[in-house]
Amino acid sequence: MKKILMIATGGTIASKETENGLTPAMTGEELAASVPGIKDKCEITVMQLMNIDSTNMRPRLWQLMSDTIIEHYNDYDGFVILHGTDTMAYTAAALSYLIQDSPKPIVLTGSQKPMGNPYTDAKINLYQSILYALDDHSCDVTVVFNGKAIAGTRARKQRTRSFAAFESMNFPVLALIHDDKILRYFRDREPSMDDLKTYHNLNDRVFVLKLTPEVKADIFHLLSSHYDAIILETFGIGGIPEYDDSFEKAIFDWVNSGKTLAVTTQVPEEGCDMEVYKVGKKYSEHPGILQAGDMTTESIVAKLMWILGQTNDQKEIRKMFYQTICLLYTSDAAD
């Protein structure tokens, strides 16, 4: 019988009603006991790593999760992390970079309604996550939610209330799960233990700046003492304003100082390409300015934190950013 380590971190799935609103209160053991049948399928060990609202998730807690999985990697056949939905996509992306090419599945799941709610989606999500983690063809980091298995670098929370909370952005779902069956769309890549690569260091000095009409160029100066990289969410396919030269100067001052700028789009689907319009093309050749293609913002945040945790050399940052960490899960961007 396979062994699964279930890591509980809190979130809606573990929450109970209080006078101050929903608050994580159920333990991992209580959550596991709430889903009949899962302990008949495998040996489950529950670890209560934390019990927080995922709004309070931080990079240091990603490191704690990653280090915990690595410490117990040889003792289990798979890992299931119970996590709040609000920052699950960030955590899934971060773990994808901290634990690369894992031959063992690392599955994140949660719910839109607490386990104790009579209409909860928690039981089916946890049950299907265990099923997916037990399957011989499962590997790497995935989000399993509402019958879908989504690559860790492609998940995004798209809905705040409905059970279909997560979508796979700019890449197909890896599998559908229904009636105890897994319908896979990808079967050709199964890494071995020799492929496994693990990391610890992260640099959390990464900021997401969303462009709005008339945004002030001074923002770069204000951020310079606190951050090493900015992710610029541009207009459309990669448009950066040029109503005067202040914004252009601020961007080049930023990257010429050795800092990093990654360009993405505010539009959820189909990605960015700065070379299409004049308002973006002038920035495309600088080694400190990176194009994120169709990566999610959550994945860009995690990837830059991981890269900057390994190096501060601008050329090496560029090389690592465009290096694909998982060939299966990419379309035109180097996840």
Regions found by a protein language model. Give the residues of each.
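Interaction/scaffold regions that mediate signaling and macromolecular assembly across diverse proteins
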Residues: Y277-E285, L290-M305
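Accessory alpha-helical/coil subdomains and C-terminal extensions
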Residues: I7-A8, S34-V35, A151-I237, E242-Y243
